[in-house]
């Protein structure tokens, strides 16, 4: 009896079924809804998965049941790919020299298949308990970015809006920091004037919060006030001088 073998066409069909099941699962996940009455019936489903349920129209299944059925269909498709790949004829150069290693290879393949099925169920089944798998993990993608891509929008728009949001948040935080700093200096000056015996404690608290001492802060504010008044007075005197000079020229004419 000749051994049963598979063709490359059958292997390609099995891979196409896996891709179709992955597409159906992606659509179901993107349209996930826990309400059975609002489940989307326009979602493309695999003909292999819905072949036995075409006659039942009594009620709508929830998204959770549909996703579970899609996962089962995907599991069956992956198993079909594995079995078809094992039935493909091997090249003459890669064939074993005798029949003894072939039995060991078959056992090894079975062990690898069982390990793969266990790992797949633990890592890809959302209803299975989470099992930590060693190795590098994929970086998390922000949900808003996925929404932008699904809606056909440019991801650069998300980046630009994110930068603008961060800039506004930084400006707001900077304004709050300056406001609290000014309030700290004013409160320290008032407490120093009302409670002179706590001068050292007030100075220590102000310095611990990143500010100058009350005396230094008051001196700096006094200097700024004097400079501002002098500059304002100089501008006022200059304006008066120019006005008097203009009046003198008009009277001379």
Swiss-Prot record:
<feature type="region of interest" description="Disordered">
    <location>
        <begin position="88"/>
        <end position="109"/>
    </location>
</feature>
<feature type="compositionally biased region" description="Low complexity">
    <location>
        <begin position="34"/>
        <end position="47"/>
    </location>
</feature>
<comment type="similarity">
    <text>Belongs to the Mediator complex subunit 10 family.</text>
</comment>
<feature type="compositionally biased region" description="Gly residues">
    <location>
        <begin position="50"/>
        <end position="60"/>
    </location>
</feature>
<dbReference type="GO" id="GO:0003712">
    <property type="term" value="F:transcription coregulator activity"/>
</dbReference>
<comment type="subunit">
    <text>Component of the Mediator complex.</text>
</comment>
<dbReference type="GO" id="GO:0016592">
    <property type="term" value="C:mediator complex"/>
</dbReference>
<dbReference type="InterPro" id="IPR019145">
    <property type="entry name" value="Mediator_Med10"/>
</dbReference>
<comment type="function">
    <text>Component of the Mediator complex, a coactivator involved in the regulated transcription of nearly all RNA polymerase II-dependent genes. Mediator functions as a bridge to convey information from gene-specific regulatory proteins to the basal RNA polymerase II transcription machinery. Mediator is recruited to promoters by direct interactions with regulatory proteins and serves as a scaffold for the assembly of a functional preinitiation complex with RNA polymerase II and the general transcription factors.</text>
</comment>
<keyword id="KW-0805">Transcription regulation</keyword>
<protein>
    <recommendedName>
        <fullName>Mediator of RNA polymerase II transcription subunit 10</fullName>
    </recommendedName>
</protein>
<dbReference type="GO" id="GO:0006357">
    <property type="term" value="P:regulation of transcription by RNA polymerase II"/>
</dbReference>
<dbReference type="Pfam" id="PF09748">
    <property type="entry name" value="Med10"/>
</dbReference>
<keyword id="KW-0539">Nucleus</keyword>
<keyword id="KW-0804">Transcription</keyword>
<keyword id="KW-0010">Activator</keyword>
<feature type="compositionally biased region" description="Gly residues">
    <location>
        <begin position="231"/>
        <end position="253"/>
    </location>
</feature>
<feature type="region of interest" description="Disordered">
    <location>
        <begin position="32"/>
        <end position="63"/>
    </location>
</feature>
<feature type="region of interest" description="Disordered">
    <location>
        <begin position="206"/>
        <end position="253"/>
    </location>
</feature>
<feature type="compositionally biased region" description="Low complexity">
    <location>
        <begin position="88"/>
        <end position="104"/>
    </location>
</feature>
């Amino acid at each position: 009896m000749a051994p049963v073998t598979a063709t490359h066409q059958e292997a390609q069909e099995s891979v196409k079924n896996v891709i179709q099941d992955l597409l159906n699962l992606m659509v179901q996940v993107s349209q996930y809804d826990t309400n059975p009455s609002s489940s989307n019936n326009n979602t493309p489903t695999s003909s292999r998965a819905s072949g036995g349920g075409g006659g039942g129209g009594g009620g709508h299944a929830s998204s959770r049941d549909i996703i579970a059925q899609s996962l089962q269909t995907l599991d069956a498709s992956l198993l079909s790919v594995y079995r078809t790949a094992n039935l493909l004829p091997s090249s003459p150069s890669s064939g074993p020299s005798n029949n003894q290693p072939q039995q060991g290879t078959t056992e090894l393949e079975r062990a690898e298949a069982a390990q793969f099925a266990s790992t797949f169920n633990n890592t890809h089944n959302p209803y299975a308990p989470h099992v930590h798998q060693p190795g590098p993990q994929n970086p998390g993608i922000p949900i808003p970015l996925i929404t932008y891509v699904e809606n056909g929008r440019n991801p650069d728009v998300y980046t630009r809006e994110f930068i603008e949001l961060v800039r506004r948040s930084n400006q707001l935080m900077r304004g709050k920091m300056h406001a609290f700093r000014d309030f700290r200096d004013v409160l320290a000056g008032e407490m120093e004037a009302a409670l002179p015996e706590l001068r050292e404690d007030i100075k220590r608290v102000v310095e611990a919060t990143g500010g100058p001492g009350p005396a230094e802060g008051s001196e700096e504010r006094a200097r700024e006030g004097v400079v501002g008044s002098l500059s304002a007075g100089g501008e006022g005197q200059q304006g008066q001088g120019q006005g008097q000079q203009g009046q003198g020229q008009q009277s001379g004419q």
